[in-house]
């Protein structure tokens, strides 16, 4: 009997050690992902997937990592594996839809049609599986408000979804309504809905800072301050509040020292991730801050830094043209 107990103890220890090792692989991949080291994340997660091929969360994080590197085919493959592992997981379907959508955005028109249809199908499935998967509802609504009927879109499909979402969460509902109007370039109504969203106790930092991105493009400093205040209450560790507050101060031409400090802090800590303003944007706004103070050399340095990080940064491109003429 003692030898049997010993064998069972060894077996239990082996299983526990294996589980710890597998969990460690996923967590190591997550840490690399959070640090924006997507190459390392992929390498770590691939090893974890080999050890535990039925772990859908590993495949999901692999898909997200591939998407950050704009590697659409492997992202789709990983997301498809996640769905195959757990077909009832709403989040897996949502991210498979996102992967299809990203590839559609970079595909030729013929391939894009098929991919767009797949995108909507996955978003719809995600919502059917979990009515309170708000991010899935938001992307489904955005798809229907922006995509043509040829691929399954149509605002008439979005309106019932917006109504259902508003009944569950007022902030999410107002955001969805505003985002739909943004797709239609009806900015007056979008403004109203986004204001209501921020007043309705939003719980999602992604929702809040998406409104921040809109406010930057519309040059709305007061809304940006509200975004920063609300975002910092919901997610104090999220660095995006610094960026949007800094931009607001530049637009208002107030407290230049504070604006510089906020934008510099953000540029040093911002993750390179979808949904976050790139560090290049912070340098471009620093350039504008210095340009308005007639500090031409400092402004030029910041705009050049922005272009080194992102050669397509329009704000920095236009500023350099101005400065060369002056």
Language model region names:
Residues 30, 64, 98, 105, ...:
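Residue-level recognition of tetratricopeptide repeat
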Residues 34-35, 68-69, 102-109, 146-147, ...:
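Register position in tetratricopeptide repeats
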Residues 47-48, 81-82, 125-126, 164-165, ...:
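Canonical positions in the second alpha-helix
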């Amino acid at each position: 009997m003692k030898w049997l107990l010993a064998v069972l103890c060894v077996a239990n220890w082996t299983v526990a050690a294996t589980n710890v090792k597998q969990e460690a692989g996923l967590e190591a991949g997550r840490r690399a992902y959070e640090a924006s080291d997507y190459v390392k994340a992929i390498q770590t997660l691939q090893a974890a997937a080999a050890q535990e091929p039925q772990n859908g969360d590993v495949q999901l994080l692999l898909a997200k990592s591939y998407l950050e590197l704009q590697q659409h085919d492997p992202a789709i493959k990983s997301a498809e594996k996640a769905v195959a592992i757990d077909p009832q997981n709403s989040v897996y379907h949502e991210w498979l839809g996102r992967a299809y959508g990203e590839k559609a955005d970079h595909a030729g028109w013929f391939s894009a049609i098929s991919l767009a249809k797949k995108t909507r199908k996955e978003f719809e499935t995600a919502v059917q599986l979990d009515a309170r998967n708000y991010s899935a509802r938001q992307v489904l609504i955005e798809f229907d408000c922006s995509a043509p009927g040829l691929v399954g879109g149509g605002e008439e499909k979005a309106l019932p979804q917006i109504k259902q979402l508003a009944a569950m969460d007022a902030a999410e509902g107002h955001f969805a309504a505003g985002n739909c109007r943004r797709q239609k370039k009806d900015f007056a109504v979008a403004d109203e809905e986004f204001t209501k969203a921020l007043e309705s106790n939003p719980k999602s930092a992604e929702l809040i800072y998406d409104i921040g991105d809109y406010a930057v493009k519309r040059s709305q400093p007061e809304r940006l301050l509200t975004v920063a205040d609300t975002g910092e209450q919901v997610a104090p560790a999220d660095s995006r509040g610094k960026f949007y507050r800094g931009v607001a101060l530049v637009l208002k031409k107030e407290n230049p020292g504070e604006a510089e400090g906020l934008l510099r802090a953000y540029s040093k800590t911002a993750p390179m991730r979808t949904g976050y303003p790139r560090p290049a944007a912070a340098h471009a706004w620093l350039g504008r801050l210095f340009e308005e103070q007639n500090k031409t050399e400092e402004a030029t340095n910041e705009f050049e830094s922005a272009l080194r990080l992102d050669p397509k940064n329009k704000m920095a491109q236009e500023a350099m043209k101005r400065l060369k003429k002056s």
